[in-house]
């Protein structure tokens, strides 16, 4: 009969905290960037008073910067869209704060309502559009900070049949 118990196998759980790393001041992993976006989204006092709507162009505001990342706030009136684009060498997290946005990619079309979050890697081509009847607001975290946004033809976001 084995006399080992869980405490002997795993060690005393109360001794583990000294092994944990202290929380980082700035995010460095995809999960931490997504968490940053969720935290900002949940704290309306950080962004709600800044939002503006512009019928002639998409409004945007750089909300925060940190080592190797930027956080942007964007508003979208009905009918406004980004055009088909990627984010160069940047990865990103898109979080819808208010309203509904539609994301078109080469594989799918997704309705993103408030609280929805999309994470993407460099080279991810998409188009984001407000095709609803109400304005929308979104939060974008780019890491590293956004230095380019190459535009693509509309066909790069259309679903195409698979050929052998």
What are these regions (language model features)?
Residues 1-44:
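N-terminal leader/capping segments at the start of a protein or of a new domain
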Residues 49-80:
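A short glycine-rich, His/Asp/Glu-containing loop-to-beta-strand
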Residues 72-87, 121-123:
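Conserved short histidine dyad/triad with adjacent acidic residue
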Residues 78, 89-104:
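Glycine- and acidic-residue-biased ligand/ion/polar-headgroup-sensing regions
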Residues 93, 133-149:
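A short hydrophobic beta-strand segment most commonly corresponding to one strand
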Residues 93, 105-125:
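Short acidic-glycine-tyrosine-enriched beta hairpin
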Residues 128-132:
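Asparagine-centered strand-capping/turn motif at beta-strand->loop junctions
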Residues 144-164:
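Extended, aromatic/histidine-rich regions of cofactor-dependent oxidoreductases associated
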